[in-house]
Amino acid sequence: MKLLKLPADQAWKHVFEFVKKTSFCKSIGSKAITYQLKYIENQIHFNCLTRNDGNDEIVSKEMFIEFYESILKIETVNTNTIKTLVPNSLYRMRSPMIALLKACGLLQNS
């Protein structure tokens, strides 16, 4: 999949608008995982019963921008190709973050 090359702040605004309108996104892998989404005080909260004991996983604006900027330079984006690029603090969030980027249109099929 190809990532739209937007400035990180603009990408955050795009994701924010998507989460305001939509309360979920689906995983892109073979497992049919649905992530519940909430936007609370400049953070995106992901929730899925099969991850993190059903507790919210939280990505702040700063974390999102760090994640987005770390994957901007590669041609093909998926959970495997970004393994070495994503900061350690966001490594576990690769799958829900890619699902969110795909759902909001920032990540498109090649």
Cite the ranges covered by each PLM segment.
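Surface-exposed polar/charged interaction patches
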Residues: 18-25, 70, 74-77, 104
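Generic structural signal of hydrophobic/aromatic residues within well-ordered alpha-helices
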Residues: 11-19, 64-71, 82, 97
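Acidic, aromatic-enriched beta-alpha/helix-loop junctions
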Residues: 49-82
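Long, low-complexity, charged/polar intrinsically disordered regions in eukaryotic proteins
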Residues: 1-62
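Short, compact, well-ordered microdomains
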Residues: 73-110
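Generic serine detector
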Residues: 23, 27-30, 60, 70, ...
